A protein has these predicted regions:
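N-terminal Sec signal peptide and the immediately downstream disordered periplasmic leader
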Residues: 1-78, 163-164, 192-193, 228, ...
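Periplasmic-side early beta-strands and strand-to-turn transitions of outer-membrane beta-barrels
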Residues: 160-162, 169-172, 179-182, 189-273, ...
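Flexible loop and strand-edge segments within Gram-negative outer membrane beta-barrel domains
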Residues: 212-217, 221-227, 240-291, 301-323, ...
Length: 667
């Protein structure tokens, strides 16, 4: 869909909504992110701040306030979470506790997003269509299988119920915005309706921008972008059942280097990225039947990237991955007297990946045509024994990988255990300890890749790669207080320390004439994290801090993906009578002087501080309208994120000052 068409449609609906809007409830103080409910950490509903698994929830209110252009803009303030890659929006990727790419499981409405193909990104969804983002930090293979060494990110899209006013049968939300960086407009429109047990949702969102500039006033080449997302849902709620059919399509067009996530300006291509996700979900929840709470999702996720090279061979390269799968679980709740209360969650997951790489419609060995089938069986029991909560879990995965070019097929089996123990010492204090193992089977590309990497250098397949296995030890404490400074206020604090030992770490080694992936032996990542949120209704404050260290124990060199020590402070004030909110965020990042000693790439990164300011107004005479302004990087500081330290010299700097404004109307 053309960007001008999207914005025109948004403006038209904004005008209509202003004329016929219904008045929502008056603003109320928000719960802190640690009070939010998550279903990712344990596959059951739980309060994020009460868990022995560090989990942070970004809810719809925060998503709307940020007016973010990417999922990474929503999560980069979470302790231990960073983004890798230069500031080209769709090419950037998340990093959790120093691990990124296929070492993080990414799920969209319960369907796996397994796509990861060298420098091409993987978070293909507009934040305007999201109702919640959940980030689980630390190994999660017991529940989510291969890839969850660093953690898991769960994205949940909006439903009709999220945009309809109480008692309304039809309604919607329209928004439009603009930012100075890249002179970029954006817009979104969501319409919902319900009749009896049925509901329907249709939504679209998109943005476009020219090239960004960094804090020095220098253009960031090939950072222009244009993307559109479409979402449709049908819901049916007969009795205690919930059926939901969902379809999403993301399309992105830009001109950029093949290695778009690095600071390169060569090998330019016209790239079109399309992701289509179709899912059918069923769940049943009857409080009178505690042994039965099943959830099943069947899905198909297809990613297709077409690249027309503008230099060199001028070939047309195709990169596709189709994941088809089913995820089924049930939770049984029961008591066993002196043996405590139990919430036993068990189920299975099956999915099949089929990938294909082409160049001018011929096979392209840099992204080899190959398939894999995965079956996982899992069980986890949350056992409450007085003040103690013991949660053991276990998962068995079997991989069957089918190779091209006559290479041997493979099968891999892996058992992933996890156990945690929490102790409610006092009503406001819960220390915990946990042990979790994660694993990542080698990707099809790592196993079977071939062809030219760059002129004079060629990929060498390695079908003998072993799975990566991580063993994470963690200790922490959850604190929660009420009525601290005034009646009704809330304070949540989480402190944690961990050590993650990774065996058979897979690293891509670039030699004089060849590039090969190999198991390097051992890596170790240690860290401490702190997260705190306070909310008093009229004002709030928050803190997020992390300090990580990562080493390749075989070479005694630092890992390149470890972010620098960082502290983020945010605070704001709500003038509830006037509907005005003002606030700011300060990010202070230390120097990163621990980087691999690799000639020809950026090494250390300097420390920096970045201040962002924001304000919004919901007029008392028009409570369905929200106007917002923000200034990112107020002092136009020039800086580089520490996870870019493997980029070629000279490396790019982050975007400079950015002034944003938006208008949102509910009707």
């Amino acid at each position: 869909m053309d960007q001008r068409t999207l914005l025109a449609a948004t403006l038209a609906l904004v005008a209509a909504g202003q004329a016929g809007a219904q008045t929502p409830d008056a603003p109320t103080p928000a719960a802190t992110p640690l009070d939010a409910v998550t279903t990712t950490a344990t596959r059951t509903r739980a309060v994020a701040g009460d868990l022995a698994t560090p989990t942070t929830v970004v809810a719809r209110e925060e998503i709307e306030r940020r007016d973010a252009r990417s999922v990474l803009d929503l999560v980069r303030d979470i302790p231990g979470v960073e983004s890798s890659g230069v500031p080209r929006t769709t090419a950037m990727q998340p990093v959790i506790r120093g691990l990124g790419d296929e070492r993080i499981v990414l799920r969209l409405d319960g369907s796996r997003n397994n796509f990861n193909a060298g420098h091409r990104g993987r978070t293909f969804v507009d934040p305007e269509l999201l109702r919640q983002v959940e980030v689980l930090r630390g190994p999660a293979s017991t529940l989510y299988g291969s890839g969850a060494l660093g953690g898991a990110i769960s994205l949940r899209t909006i439903n009709a119920e999220d945009i309809l006013q109480p008692g309304a049968s039809f309604g919607g939300v329209a928004s439009m915005g603009w930012q100075s960086q890249g002179s970029g407009p954006r817009g979104s429109l969501a319409l919902g309706a319900r009749a009896g047990d049925f509901s329907v949702l249709g939504a679209m969102a998109g943005f476009s921008n020219n090239n960004f500039t960094d804090g020095r006033g220098t253009t960031i080449p090939y950072s222009e972008d244009e993307a559109t997302s479409l979402l449709g849902k049908l819901g049916w709620n007969p009795g205690h059942h919930r059926f939901e059919l969902s379809a999403m399509r993301f399309r992105d067009n830009n001109t950029l280097p093949i290695a778009a996530s690095t600071a390169t300006t060569t090998s330019i291509t016209d790239r079109e990225t399309v992701q289509e996700t179709l899912s059918l979900r069923w769940s049943y929840d009857d409080p009178s039947m505690p042994l039965l709470a099943p959830q099943i999702v069947v899905y198909r996720n297809h990613v297709d990237i077409q690249e027309r090279r503008l230099t060199g061979t001028r070939a047309v390269d195709g990169t596709t991955l189709t994941t088809t799968g089913i995820d089924a679980q049930n939770t049984s709740r029961f008591g066993l007297g002196a043996f405590g209360r139990h919430a036993l969650t068990y189920g299975f997951e099956y999915y099949r990946d089929e990938q294909e790489g082409t160049s001018n419609n011929l096979s392209r060995s840099q992204f080899p045509t190959a398939q894999q089938s995965v079956l996982g069986l899992f069980a986890q029991d949350e056992i409450t024994l007085g003040a103690f909560t013991l949660t053991p879990g276990l998962r068995l995965d079997r991989f069957e990988q089918e190779s091209p070019n006559g290479l041997n097929d493979r099968s891999v089996d892996r058992v992933s255990p996890r156990v945690s123990l929490g102790w409610q010492v006092l009503p406001w204090m819960q220390p915990y300890v946990s042990y979790a193992e994660g694993f990542r089977a080698p990707s099809l590309t790592e196993l079977y890749v071939g062809g030219q990497h760059f002129p004079g250098n060629f990929f060498v397949p390695n079908p003998n790669l072993r799975p990566e296995v991580s063993r994470n030890k963690e200790a922490g404490v959850n604190l929660r207080f009420a009525d601290v400074l005034r009646d009704g206020d809330r304070l949540r604090v989480r402190l944690s320390a961990f050590r993650n030992d990774i065996d058979d770490f897979i690293e891509q080694t670039v030699l004089a004439t060849t590039t090969v992936s190999r198991n390097i032996g051992q890596a170790r990542i240690t860290g401490v994290e702190a997260e705190a949120q306070y909310d008093a209704g009229t004002w709030w404050a928050g803190l997020g801090a992390s300090a990580l260290k990562g080493d390749n124990l075989e070479t005694d060199q630092p890992l390149a993906s470890i972010p620098a020590h960082r502290v983020t402070l945010n605070a704001g004030y709500r003038f509830l009578d006037q509907g005005v909110t003002v606030g700011g965020r300060l990010t202070a990042t230390a120097e990163q002087d621990r980087a691999p000693r690799t000639p020809g790439v950026a090494q250390q990164t300097s420390g920096y501080g970045v201040l962002d300011l924001f304000a919004s107004w919901t007029p008392t005479a028009a409570p369905n309208v929200r106007l917002a302004v923000a200034v990112d990087n107020v002092f136009d500081h020039a800086y580089r994120r520490s996870t870019w330290n493997s980029d070629p010299v000279p490396a790019f700097y982050e975007t400079g000052r950015n002034i944003r404004g938006s208008l949102r109307i509910a009707f």
